Swiss-Prot record:
The active site is at S175 (nucleophile). Monomer. Binds 1 FMN per subunit. It catalyses: (S)-dihydroorotate + a quinone = orotate + a quinol. Substrate binds at K66, N111, R112, F113, G114, F115, N172, N177, N246, T247. It comes from Methylobacillus flagellatus (strain ATCC 51484 / DSM 6875 / VKM B-1610 / KT). This is Dihydroorotate dehydrogenase (quinone). The lineage of its organism: Bacteria, Pseudomonadati, Pseudomonadota, Betaproteobacteria, Nitrosomonadales. Pathway: Pyrimidine metabolism; UMP biosynthesis via de novo pathway; orotate from (S)-dihydroorotate (quinone route): step 1/1. FMN binds at A62, G63, L64, D65, K66, T86, N139, N172, K217, T245, G268, G297, Y318, S319. Catalyzes the conversion of dihydroorotate to orotate with quinone as electron acceptor. It comes from the Bacteria. Its EC number is 1.3.5.2. The gene is pyrD. One of its GO terms (cellular component) is plasma membrane.
């Protein structure tokens, strides 16, 4: 109810400014205790995925809280799990502003943030200070100036750093806003990366006395052969999960709209069908070998249900929150039960 009142005012602001304003005020509400008055979503059936017990299947996708600065506030909205990041070894400013654009006629968002973040050490200080005891995923990436030939070093650095703090780790090789990042999805490069990460995961599990699952986040702009290759590599290297999908470079569904030709990744409702198709394809190739977390274009409980029917075990939201607000979590929980 409250979000529907403030949304018209927020939409008058620059999209990134509205994003930051909302998070800062949500944090103020949490610190004042007023967020405790927000009604919790209905009870959902718990899910066990990647060996983790998720209190409900609705998660927050990476990108909203890049530095883990708002975990406690976001937890008050009833998510079954929260994913923070994408984080890189060193701080970086990301791409020049403006870099986030709404397409309200299509309920879409375009962003070209470029992994703007304060670096992995700042994120870990924020995580250490949180009161949150729920399921926390940490999404890791490479710095923009790290060449792909050395990308594995950035991912391993972040994996070692976040391992003691995360319930699961997501490897982001699918953002369209870091030059050549998606080339890491190609068969040879991906095989080398997965092999190195899997080896390090076992070393860290022995070192810390606990196993932290690793998931791979992939793009929606893949053909059937590419999806098949990725699925085969995930199974070969015994990865724990896959998140489908990131944002799309396609514009065919919004090409006539203002801002549609802005560079960056498109998310929200225009991504829905493309994302679901990748989930269905992955599900066919994986045949239950590892779980899928579905994300992309979820703006209702019915949208989430379609992801589950396509083969996802859990779902995540981000752009849907821009248009629906926190009631979206409640809607999905009621639909999925």
């Amino acid at each position: 109810m409250l979000y529907s009142i403030v949304k018209p005012w927020l939409f008058r602001l620059d999209a990134e400014r509205a994003h930051d304003f909302t998070l800062k005020n949500l944090k103020r509400l949490e610190r004042s205790g007023l967020l405790n008055l927000y009604p919790r979503p209905p009870k959902c059936k718990q899910r066990q995925v990647m060996g983790i017990n998720f209190p409900n299947p609705v998660g927050l996708a990476a990108g909203l809280d890049k530095n883990g600065a708002y975990i406690d506030a976001l937890a008050g909205l009833g998510f079954g799990f929260i994913e923070i990041g994408t984080i890189t070894p060193r701080p970086q400013p990301g791409n020049p502003k403006p870099r986030m654009f709404r397409l309200p006629e299509a309920q879409g968002v375009i962003n070209r943030f470029g992994f703007n973040n304060l670096g992995v050490d700042v994120l870990l200080r924020n995580v250490a200070a949180t009161k949150y005891k729920g399921v926390l995923g940490i999404n890791i990436g490479k710095n923009f100036d790290t060449p792909n030939e050395r990308a594995v070093d950035d991912y391993l650095h972040c994996l070692r750093k976040v391992y003691p703090y995360a319930h699961y780790v997501t490897v982001n090789i699918s953002s369209p806003n870091t030059k050549n990042l998606r080339a890491l999805q190609e068969k040879e490069a991906l095989g080398q990366l997965l092999h190195a990460l899997k080896q390090e995961q076992q070393v860290l599990a022995d070192q810390h006395g606990r196993y932290v699952p690793i998931a791979l986040k992939i793009a929606p702009d893949l053909d059937e052969g590419q999806v098949a290759d990725i699925a085969a590599l995930l199974m070969k290297h015994q990865f724990d999960g896959v998140i489908a999908t990131n944002t799309t470079l396609a514009r065919d569904m919004v090409q006539a709209l203002p801002c549609a030709q802005e560079a960056g990744g498109l998310s929200g409702a225009p991504l829905r069908d493309r994302s679901t198709a990748v989930i269905q394809s992955l599900s066919n190739h994986l045949a239950g070998a590892l779980p899928i977390i579905g994300v992309g274009g979820i703006l209702s409980g019915e949208d989430a249900e379609q992801k589950i029917k396509a083969g996802a075990s859990l779902v995540q939201v981000y752009s849907g929150l821009v248009y629906r607000g926190p009631v979206l979590v409640d809607d999905i929980c009621r639909t999925l039960g």
